[in-house]
């Protein structure tokens, strides 16, 4: 794999004369004509969007043809954070816009389902709407009312998407928990909500593994008395339906007309959950209007998706990316849905994400940066094995994308595509930073703040840090998709403490952000996971940037245990060796690489060999939870299981051994 300098230009920004080729370009050409503004670059357009926040979001509403059952009084009635008031007076419904998108495509395949558990199939736009109406009839018979919470304990399949649309169109609140989560992880989330109904599957396959969820459903019903349960026979079409549970076929037996309940802009739509690193997962409530206008901006303007696209978002149903992916249907684009292990039977096998793209004529691909890095470091050449010429854009997130991996994408996937490393969060169910059709692509960097995002990098004193220095990622003006509230946080104190405790009235996200001299951006790690060695701050991304490419190293994680007296502390590197690698030789290579490419200060005090490191299914390293568990264990404290939610981990059985190995080396 070719090495690459940070910031190397991989694709230039389009000429001003080419702006009309994208939805974003045409949007700003209209703004120029109607408002007398002038834009030469994306930076100009972004600056206008944050300087004229009400105008911008009002124009997004107009451009994307939001269906309003009552008009809004003004765009932004209060700019206070938290508590900004967006589009007061408007009556809308998120689900109605997805149904409009589905109906507009009629007989075109819109939900193209690929599964390791059952046979493949597709639903046309009309068929998907029919399923939505059948689910609505079942919900109504079950007594689900506006404001009730409905849970989907389901994978990324058409039924889950139809359930999401049906529930929210009726004004009820949806919550998704992925089937890889066990009973405790599910209950830690949904018990907070007191849901009235759950739709669950009987089981599923993950590669060669067959996993039952029958006992989990029974335990959930026992823990939440009175909940209505629906069983979807997924692993076994003839699965026995327990007493007191309704079969999916009976639940969806009656067809009906599509029903929509218009609701105020700030009405709860969906509950997403934090990763649970500081107690039970935060139940983050997002509203109909916030996700509607934000996802319209994302999908149409930032990602340039329209009815000609066939999109593939690889995501578990527990990740915010899945919620964003479902909104794709608003654009008339179709979705390729995959449920299964993308590394089975091999990283470049028939179930790989690359195979999903090539075999299904995908044009837009959203995945984890970790997946791209793993493919690159494994020497995979997807562009040679599959026809990926139709892939016009790759969006990647979850962790920083290294410069050499970005170069690999252009060399081995498609030289003409647009690569868009992005960063956002469950907290806003969208992004702060991304690529854009009007911007270029630089290796190892994120191109631009998203439109309408007043992004900055701040010092502890609350001022913009100099170019090239890390600061706290802040958002200085409100966004429509900031959470309405946290469920159960009646006084709002937990919400305020999560984002507004450092800079009152200013959103602090918790990432270290660097603004480069190229006007691009780098996230160097979580600010609460930063390593402070003798007063020098080190971002974890700096380590992974030099370690991930090492030939014999399969994975790694860096932990720093501070010295209360202000000394250097203990720096521990968890390392996973590839099969056949010489651990002693690899340890020397690791230390030499870190010493020469970073600095002697970065060299770990201990290298601990482990079978895996704690990662979520989306590839996110869980440094902070692991560090807390180690600290609590050493101090003899009782550890709440929610400190590290094993239900979200790829290798939960390895965790106890990893914890013990770290404790063993610490003095």
Which stretches of residues belong to each language-model region?
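AMP-binding adenylation
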Residues: 1-19, 208-209, 222-223, 240-244, ...
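AMP-dependent adenylate-forming
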Residues: 31-38, 97-124, 235-243
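Conserved AMP-binding/adenylate-forming core of the ANL superfamily
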Residues: 43-48, 95, 111-165, 182-187, ...
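Conserved pre-ATP/AMP-binding loop-to-beta segment of ANL
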Residues: 107-109, 231, 242-273, 280, ...
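Adenylate-forming
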Residues: 155, 197-216, 236, 339-343, ...
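Structural core segment of the AMP-binding/adenylate-forming
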Residues: 165, 169-250, 360, 368-369
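Conserved AMP-binding/adenylation subdomain of ANL enzymes
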Residues: 292-310, 320-363, 378
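Conserved AMP-binding/adenylate-forming
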Residues: 301, 392-520, 527-530
């Amino acid at each position: 794999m070719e090495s690459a300098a940070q910031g190397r230009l991989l694709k230039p920004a389009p000429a001003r004369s080419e702006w009309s080729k994208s939805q974003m370009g045409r949007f700003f050409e209209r703004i120029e004509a109607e408002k007398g503004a002038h834009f030469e670059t994306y930076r100009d357009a972004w600056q206008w969007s944050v300087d004229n926040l009400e105008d911008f979001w009002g124009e997004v509403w107009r451009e994307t043809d939001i269906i309003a059952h009552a008009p809004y009084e003004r765009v932004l009635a209060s700019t206070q954070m938290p508590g900004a008031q967006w589009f007061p007076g408007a009556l809308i419904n998120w689900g109605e816009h997805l149904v409009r998108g589905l109906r507009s495509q009629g007989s075109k395949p819109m939900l193209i389902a690929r599964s390791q558990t059952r046979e493949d199939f597709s639903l046309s736009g009309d068929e998907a709407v029919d399923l939505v109406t059948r689910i609505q009839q079942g919900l109504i018979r079950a007594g689900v009312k506006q404001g009730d919470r409905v849970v989907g304990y389901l994978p990324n399949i058409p039924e889950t998407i139809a359930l999401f649309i049906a529930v929210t169109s009726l004004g009820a609140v949806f919550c998704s928990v992925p089937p890889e989560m066990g009973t405790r992880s599910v209950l830690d989330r949904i018990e907070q909500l007191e849901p009235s109904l759950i739709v669950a599957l009987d089981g599923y396959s993950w590669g060669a593994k067959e996993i039952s969820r029958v006992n989990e459903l029974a335990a959930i019903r026992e823990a939440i008395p009175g909940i209505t349960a629906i069983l979807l026979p997924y692993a076994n079409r003839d699965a026995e339906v327990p007493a007191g549970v309704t079969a999916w076929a009976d639940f969806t037996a009656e067809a009906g007309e599509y029903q929509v309940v218009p609701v105020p802009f700030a009405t709860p739509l969906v509950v997403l959950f934090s990763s649970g690193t500081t107690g039970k997962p935060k139940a983050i409530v997002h509203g109909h209007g916030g996700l509607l206008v934000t996802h319209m901006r994302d999908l149409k303007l930032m990602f340039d998706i329209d009815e000609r696209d066939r999109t593939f978002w690889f995501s578990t149903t527990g990740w915010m990316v899945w919620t964003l992916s479902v909104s794709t249907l608003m654009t008339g684009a179709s979705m390729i849905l995959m449920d299964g292990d993308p590394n089975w039977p091999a990283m470049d096998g028939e179930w790989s994400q690359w195979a999903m793209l090539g075999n299904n004529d995908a044009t837009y691909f959203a995945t984890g940066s970790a997946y791209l890095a793993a493919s690159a470091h494994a020497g995979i050449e997807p562009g040679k094995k599959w026809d990926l010429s139709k892939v016009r854009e790759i969006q990647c997130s979850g962790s920083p994308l290294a410069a050499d991996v970005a170069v690999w994408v252009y060399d081995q996937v498609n030289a003409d595509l647009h690569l868009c490393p992005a960063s956002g969060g469950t907290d806003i169910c969208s992004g702060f930073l991304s690529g854009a059709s009007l911007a270029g692509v630089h290796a190892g960097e994120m191109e631009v703040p998203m439109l309408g995002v007043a992004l900055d990098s701040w010092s502890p004193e609350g001022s913009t840090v100099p170019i090239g220095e890390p600061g706290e990622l802040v958002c200085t003006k409100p966004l429509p998709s900031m959470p309405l509230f946290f469920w159960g946080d009646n006084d709002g104190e937990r919400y305020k403490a999560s984002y507004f405790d450092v800079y009152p009235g200013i959103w602090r996200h918790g990432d270290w952000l660097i603004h480069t001299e190229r006007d691009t951006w780098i996230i160097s790690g979580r600010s609460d996971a930063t390593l402070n060695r003798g007063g020098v701050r080190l971002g974890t991304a700096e380590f992974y940037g030099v370690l991930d490419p090492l030939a014999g190293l399969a994975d790694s994680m860096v932990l720093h245990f501070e010295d209360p007296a202000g000394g250097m502390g203990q720096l521990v590197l968890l390392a996973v060796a590839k099969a056949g690698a010489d651990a002693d030789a690899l340890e020397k290579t690791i230390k030499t690489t870190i010493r020469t490419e970073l600095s002697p200060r970065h060299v770990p005090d201990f290298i601990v060999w482990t079978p895996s490191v704690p990662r979520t299914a989306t590839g996110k390293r869980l440094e902070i939870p692991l560090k807390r568990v180690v600290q609590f264990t050493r101090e003899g404290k009782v550890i709440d299981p929610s400190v590290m939610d094993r239900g979200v981990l790829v290798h939960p059985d390895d965790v106890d051994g990893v914890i013990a190995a770290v404790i063993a080396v610490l003095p």
